[in-house]
């Protein structure tokens, strides 16, 4: 009977029929199987311990499409829980291929969301056959055990034939020099040459990078020169020099040395600075006027009884705002009630007939 584990994401509660549908599909495809289910967060925190090499298949259910990443620690735990050739499938991410391979899984050729735990390959020892007489070392190799090579000292007769200054050599009595050993030596030599070539090519590329770092961009020099003072880089011709050796403060009428352009540039900068200052002052004045207007609206003007009292111009000592009503129309205001009447003396009783009609 197959053992199947369902790892549920916490957001699976949003769909109550999702897990039941997955279990129904398992019964149709596998038949009689032992199905377990756990929340993936509890497995990650270690609250639920899973037995190693137990489950034939692990299915990850995650309805959250925007977040399906799996940490490397959980991948390792799932790998240890599966049996050999077990499958880890479901809502798996497709952008973690490197983590999958580093853990030990193999991505299925037919389905990107199916990871397979490969069966370990057993190592097989292959004995090497040597030419020549069979020695004790070869016998031990055929029996499955490896023996150390035996060395013997050269005889004195062979030493006399060789140069007296040459050191005493040792010979390996366990094996003779064969063609296979020569081939192996040639292979090792080629590998060594390839390694040397790779090392020197890498060092050359590093030197080229260092040389590129020392190169100065010409555009940077131009930018630095533009930041200098324009007057310091100005070359004044001899015809523009003053006899006492001083420099001209203003450009000539027909300036050709560039001083006129510098003055125009400085004037434009000064004008723009003044415009910005005036603009800020106008803006601040407008804001202050708006604040004063709002403050006046919040505090309405109220007149007292003394301000609203009527003034009797016929009484001596009491005059209007202008104090010239008795002198005639030439000295009266636009709204004066005595307009059209002849002049009168202060204290004289004057009756106004039209005033009653208005009331």
From Swiss-Prot:
GO terms for biological process: cellular response to oxidative stress; iron-sulfur cluster assembly; negative regulation of hydrogen peroxide-mediated programmed cell death; negative regulation of nitric oxide biosynthetic process. A motif (Cx2C motif 1) lies at residues 322-325. Residues 159-228 are annotated as: Linker. InterPro entries: Anamorsin (IPR007785), CIAPIN1 (IPR046408), Dre2_N (IPR031838). Residues 167-177 have a biased composition (Polar residues). A motif (Cx2C motif 2) lies at residues 333-336. It is found in: Cytoplasm; Mitochondrion intermembrane space. The keyword 4Fe-4S applies. Residues 322-336 are annotated as: Fe-S binding site B. [4Fe-4S] cluster binds at residues 322, 325, 333, 336. Monomer. Interacts with TAH18. Interacts with MIA40. This is Fe-S cluster assembly protein DRE2. It comes from Scheffersomyces stipitis (strain ATCC 58785 / CBS 6054 / NBRC 10063 / NRRL Y-11545).
């Amino acid at each position: 009977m197959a053992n199947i584990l369902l790892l549920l994401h916490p957001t699976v509660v949003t769909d109550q029929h999702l897990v039941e549908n997955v279990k129904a599909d398992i019964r149709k495809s596998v038949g009689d199987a032992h199905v377990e289910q756990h929340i993936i967060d509890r497995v990650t925190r270690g609250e639920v311990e899973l037995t190693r090499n137990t489950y034939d298949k692990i299915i990850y259910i995650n309805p959250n499409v925007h977040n399906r990443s799996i940490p490397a620690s959980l991948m390792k735990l799932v790998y240890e829980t599966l049996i050999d050739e077990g499958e880890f499938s479901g809502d798996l991410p497709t952008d973690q291929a490197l983590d999958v391979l580093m853990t030990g899984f193999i991505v299925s050729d037919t389905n990107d969301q199916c990871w397979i735990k490969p069966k370990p390959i057993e190592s097989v020892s292959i004995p090497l056959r040597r030419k020549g007489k069979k020695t004790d070392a070869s016998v031990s190799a055929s029996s499955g055990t490896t023996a150390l090579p035996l060395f013997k000292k050269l005889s004195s007769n062979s030493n006399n034939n060789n140069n007296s200054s040459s050191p005493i050599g040792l010979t390996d009595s366990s094996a003779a020099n064969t063609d296979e050993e020569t081939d192996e030596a040639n292979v090792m030599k080629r590998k060594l040459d390839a390694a040397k070539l790779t090392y020197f090519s890498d060092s050359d590329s590093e030197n080229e990078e260092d040389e590129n770092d020392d190169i100065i961009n010409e555009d940077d020099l131009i930018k630095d020169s533009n930041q200098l003072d324009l007057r310091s880089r100005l070359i004044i011709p001899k015809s523009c020099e003053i006899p006492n050796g001083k420099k001209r403060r203003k450009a000539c009428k027909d300036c050709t040395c560039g001083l006129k352009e510098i003055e125009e540039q400085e004037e434009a900068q000064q004008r723009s600075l003044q415009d910005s200052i005036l603009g800020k002052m106008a803006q601040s004045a407008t804001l202050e006027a708006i604040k004063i207007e709002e403050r006046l609206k919040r505090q309405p003007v109220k007149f007292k009884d003394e301000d609203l009292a009527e003034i009797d111009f016929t009484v001596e000592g009491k005059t209007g705002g202008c104090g010239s009503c008795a002198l005639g129309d030439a000295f009266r205001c636009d709204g004066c009630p005595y307009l059209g009447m002849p002049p009168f003396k202060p204290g004289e009783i004057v009756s106004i007939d039209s005033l009653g009609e208005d009331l």
